[in-house]
A protein has these predicted regions:
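Bacterial Sec-dependent N-terminal signal peptides
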Residues: 1-25
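CBM-like carbohydrate-recognition segments
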Residues: 23-56, 64-112, 118-120, 124-127, ...
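Helix-capping and short linker residues that terminate individual alpha-solenoid repeat units
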Residues: 42, 46, 70, 86-91, ...
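Positions within ordered alpha-helical repeat solenoids
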Residues: 64, 123, 143-146, 168, ...
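Asp-box/WD-like beta-propeller blade repeats and closely related beta-sheet repeat scaffolds
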Residues: 130-166
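Extended ligand-binding clefts on enzyme/binding-domain cores
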Residues: 157, 167-275, 281-293, 305-331
Length: 331
């Protein structure tokens, strides 16, 4: 999974604000990094794999690489994957058996880990509109929105897996219900796993302090879990209309969370698995560090985070993450 997060990082670095000369030079290096990592990944991994999160997350990064580089082989790779999966997540057509607890079989249609694929399908639709590409995405999400339940996003990963699906489909359909349900579902998530004092998310309700503690008695915030959220908020803000009534809610959440994450960065530039207790699981949590970097860079580049404050954070963790790419560093 490390390649996924390096790709997200590389795409974010590719739009760093710099002087013209530095920007041109850096762009060449970033694209070299993207191509070496991504082309190696695609050469070693068939696109004909399931649409569950473990593969679908990669395609969110692959599409960002395509948008940045224009490399048609990247787009083709994701289209092959989408066609292999019939532009679906979980494939059950019997709504009576659709579930959203954890599961990997075809009845888990409403589970966010089987909805992240809709992000890539929507990206591909926007490049070449064809209703078949988002037919299933709309069927699933619009059925979900028609139900009275609002507890679909019960674990932090869902805020990357499913939350951006709502804004992407809103941009296609202009159906305001996507935004209102997005807000409603996030409010529920906040009610069960958000720590208002720390501005961070627990992995899920089982990890709430003080019911759950680290071995040293501290709050246990999982780096990749919070990184999913920060990156997910960045993706939502990218598509969320500024005139939307709850837009400032999302801005505040993104900014407050970025501040909280930056404050507990390790001196070496990374975040540990349990962010407030480095001794609980020492050493870098690379996937979380990469996704945090993506979120920080997106926020800087789009005016949501102050460059003077957050670029030093990025410069610290950038070295740590890029040093973890053995393929690139071998050249």
């Amino acid at each position: 999974m490390k390649q996924v997060f390096k790709l997200l990082l590389a795409c974010a670095v590719g739009v760093l604000p710099m002087s013209v000369g530095a920007r041109d030079s850096e762009a060449v290096e970033v694209r070299k990094m993207i191509d070496k990592v991504n082309q190696h990944w695609q050469a070693e991994n068939s696109p004909e794999v399931r649409s569950f999160w473990d593969n679908a997350v990669y395609h969110t990064g692959n599409m960002e690489a395509y948008f940045l580089t224009g490399n048609e082989t990247y787009r083709t790779y994701s289209e092959t994957w989408a066609n292999y999966n019939q532009w679906k997540g979980a494939k059950s057509d019997n709504r009576a058996e659709w579930k959203y607890s954890y599961g990997e079989s075809d009845e888990y249609v409403l589970f966010g880990d089987y909805q992240i694929c809709f992000q890539t399908y929507t990206d591909l639709y926007n490049l070449a509109p064809d209703d078949k590409k988002i037919k299933r995405a709309r069927e699933v999400m619009e059925y979900q929105m028609s139900t009275p339940q609002h507890d679909y996003w019960w674990w932090s990963d869902a805020l990357y897996m499913a939350m951006p699906v709502m804004t992407k489909l809103y941009k296609v359909t202009h159906n305001a219900k996507y935004l209102d349900k997005l807000y409603e579902y996030l409010i529920y998530s906040d009610s069960i796993m958000f720590d208002k004092d720390e501005n961070l998310y627990y992995r899920d309700a089982k990890y709430i302090y003080p019911k759950h503690k680290t071995v040293n008695g501290k709050k246990d915030f999982w780096a990749r879990g919070d990184a999913w959220v920060l990156a997910g908020l960045a993706k939502v803000l990218k598509d969320l209309p500024v005139e939307y009534k709850h837009h400032q809610f999302f801005v505040d959440k993104f900014q407050n969370m970025a501040k909280a994450v930056a404050a507990i960065q390790q001196p070496e530039g990374y975040w540990t698995r349990s962010m407030m207790d480095p001794e609980f699981a020492p050493g870098p949590e690379t996937s979380g560090t990469a996704l945090f970097t993506y979120g920080f860079l997106w926020g800087i580049n789009n005016g949501y985070l102050e460059k003077d404050i957050y670029m030093p954070v990025v410069q610290e963790d950038l070295y740590d993450v890029t040093a973890e790419i053995p393929l690139y560093n071998a050249f």
